[in-house]
């Protein structure tokens, strides 16, 4: 899809073109990555990039906001329709910015945040000590059970003991469905706010492929670039008028200045795409592909965290299955043009810079048209590479040839419209 560009800045032009070539020629299995449509990318590089406009539609601190006001209003209305919710803020620059806004709106410094342990699939911004969320707030962790599943009774016990001010559900490497209703019960018992961080599963929720937190979570945050297939950015949703007012005040003037109107325009385009019937079909295929992909490894005797998946991702325990750490596995696969990421697993004994796991996701290659058959091929290739550990020149050449055939047969698409 990506056309060669020619800038007067030849150095940057060449690097952009090399990155486009890399994306076209490699298999992308990082669960948090996707391919935005050409419409989204074009909208993200247009004239609203030049416009400054602190504040909200109709209440800006600058003149000349007639059209950007309309753009932001459209983005808000579309995302509200998409998630069937009353209030939305589309200004956050990222998912972490959205989380920071929620904490600042609802908590005081030192208040307690209860989130999933990072090794078990949580996120840095859910109270981890080296992140702002753990520096300014008191992070407390809950864990998975012996089957590597959420143990709601155990989470409730931790909540009753520690009395958190905010409980977070929503993860970066958890492959099972989340019971938002049960989480709300727990939150209510300790008078805590419930935040659903749906950054990874937002598209699946919008398409009906995962239960929605709307009606259960007091507040919802997300990115827009993962399963929503939009530009890089964040958003905040709620049904509470009171919470919405607090959020708006914190996003601006609390933690951000002028919004990125070019990105808000691109978000609006992505939300329109996500409202189409074919987006539901796409998300259904993501889930089918992930389930099939994981089952192919399980058939080969490979250990998958929680023994499968119900969403778009899963994590292989490469240490016990292949006697490799996650970093080694990632490097090996990249040598044959398959892009993945090392990832911690529950109770990981290795550092986050090495890890025992390898996370795999299906959104990006499903965007290119992969179905179960292609993911069967990927499982065969990945299993072969990781079992071999050291590939000779001929093996590397042969695998790269197979990858090249797949990427040529399934190029990055300009548009997802039928």
Swiss-Prot record:
<dbReference type="GO" id="GO:0004372">
    <property type="term" value="F:glycine hydroxymethyltransferase activity"/>
</dbReference>
<keyword id="KW-0808">Transferase</keyword>
<dbReference type="GO" id="GO:0005829">
    <property type="term" value="C:cytosol"/>
</dbReference>
<comment type="function">
    <text>Catalyzes the reversible interconversion of serine and glycine with tetrahydrofolate (THF) serving as the one-carbon carrier. This reaction serves as the major source of one-carbon groups required for the biosynthesis of purines, thymidylate, methionine, and other important biomolecules.</text>
</comment>
<dbReference type="GO" id="GO:0035999">
    <property type="term" value="P:tetrahydrofolate interconversion"/>
</dbReference>
<dbReference type="InterPro" id="IPR019798">
    <property type="entry name" value="Ser_HO-MeTrfase_PLP_BS"/>
</dbReference>
<protein>
    <recommendedName>
        <fullName>Probable serine hydroxymethyltransferase</fullName>
        <ecNumber>2.1.2.1</ecNumber>
    </recommendedName>
</protein>
<dbReference type="InterPro" id="IPR039429">
    <property type="entry name" value="SHMT-like_dom"/>
</dbReference>
<feature type="binding site">
    <location>
        <begin position="122"/>
        <end position="124"/>
    </location>
    <ligand>
        <name>(6S)-5,6,7,8-tetrahydrofolate</name>
    </ligand>
</feature>
<keyword id="KW-0663">Pyridoxal phosphate</keyword>
<dbReference type="Pfam" id="PF00464">
    <property type="entry name" value="SHMT"/>
</dbReference>
<comment type="pathway">
    <text>One-carbon metabolism; tetrahydrofolate interconversion.</text>
</comment>
<dbReference type="InterPro" id="IPR015422">
    <property type="entry name" value="PyrdxlP-dep_Trfase_small"/>
</dbReference>
<comment type="subunit">
    <text>Homodimer.</text>
</comment>
<feature type="binding site">
    <location>
        <begin position="351"/>
        <end position="353"/>
    </location>
    <ligand>
        <name>(6S)-5,6,7,8-tetrahydrofolate</name>
    </ligand>
</feature>
<feature type="modified residue" description="N6-(pyridoxal phosphate)lysine">
    <location>
        <position position="226"/>
    </location>
</feature>
<dbReference type="GO" id="GO:0030170">
    <property type="term" value="F:pyridoxal phosphate binding"/>
</dbReference>
<dbReference type="InterPro" id="IPR001085">
    <property type="entry name" value="Ser_HO-MeTrfase"/>
</dbReference>
<dbReference type="InterPro" id="IPR015424">
    <property type="entry name" value="PyrdxlP-dep_Trfase"/>
</dbReference>
<dbReference type="InterPro" id="IPR049943">
    <property type="entry name" value="Ser_HO-MeTrfase-like"/>
</dbReference>
<dbReference type="InterPro" id="IPR015421">
    <property type="entry name" value="PyrdxlP-dep_Trfase_major"/>
</dbReference>
<keyword id="KW-0554">One-carbon metabolism</keyword>
<feature type="binding site">
    <location>
        <position position="118"/>
    </location>
    <ligand>
        <name>(6S)-5,6,7,8-tetrahydrofolate</name>
    </ligand>
</feature>
<dbReference type="GO" id="GO:0019264">
    <property type="term" value="P:glycine biosynthetic process from serine"/>
</dbReference>
<keyword id="KW-0963">Cytoplasm</keyword>
<comment type="similarity">
    <text>Belongs to the SHMT family.</text>
</comment>
């Amino acid at each position: 899809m990506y056309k060669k560009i020619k800038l007067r800045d030849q150095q940057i032009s060449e690097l952009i073109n090399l990155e486009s070539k890399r994306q076209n020629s490699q298999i992308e299995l990082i669960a948090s990555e996707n391919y935005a449509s050409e419409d989204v990318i074009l909208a993200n590089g247009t004239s609203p990039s030049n416009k400054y406009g602190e504040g909200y539609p109709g209440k800006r601190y600058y003149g000349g906001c007639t059209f950007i006001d309309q753009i932001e209003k459209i983005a808000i209305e579309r995302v509200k329709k998409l998630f069937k919710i009353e209030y939305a803020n589309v200004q956050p620059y990222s998912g972490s910015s959205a989380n920071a806004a929620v904490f600042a709106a609802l908590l005081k410094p030192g208040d307690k945040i209860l989130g999933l342990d990072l090794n078990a699939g949580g996120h840095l911004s859910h109270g981890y000590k080296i992140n702002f969320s753990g520096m300014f707030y008191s992070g407390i962790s809950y864990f998975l059970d012996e089957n590597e599943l959420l143990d709601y009774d155990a989470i409730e016990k931790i909540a009753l003991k520690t009395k958190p001010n905010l409980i977070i559900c929503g993860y970066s490497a958890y492959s099972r469905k989340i019971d938002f209703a049960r989480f709300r019960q727990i939150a209510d018992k300790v008078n805590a706010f419930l935040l659903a961080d749906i950054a990874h599963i937002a598209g699946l929720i919008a398409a009906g492929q995962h239960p929605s937190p709307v009606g259960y979570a007091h507040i919802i945050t997300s990115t827009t670039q993962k399963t929503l297939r939009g530009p890089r950015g964040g958003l905040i949703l709620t049904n509470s008028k009171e919470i919405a007012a607090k959020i708006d005040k914190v996003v601006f003037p609390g933690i951000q200045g002028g919004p990125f109107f070019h990105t808000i325009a691109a978000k609006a385009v992505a939300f329109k795409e996500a409202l189409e019937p074919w987006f539901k079909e796409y998300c259904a295929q993501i889930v089918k592909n992930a389930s099939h992909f994981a089952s192919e490894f399980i058939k080969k005797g490979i250990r998958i965290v929680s023994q499968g998946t119900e969403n778009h991702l899963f994590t292989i325990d490469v240490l016990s299955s292949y006697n490799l750490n996650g970093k080694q596995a990632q490097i090996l696969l990249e040598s044959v043009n398959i892009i993945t990421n090392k990832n911690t697993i529950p109770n990981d004994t290795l550092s986050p810079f090495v890890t025992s796991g390898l996370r795999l996701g299906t959104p990006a290659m499903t965007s290119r048209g992969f179905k179960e058959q292609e993911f069967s091929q990927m499982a065969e290739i990945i299993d072969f590479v990781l079992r071999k550990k050291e590939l000779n020149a001929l093996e590397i050449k042969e695998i790269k040839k197979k990858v090249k055939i797949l990427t040529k047969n399934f190029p990055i698409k300009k548009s997802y419209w039928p």
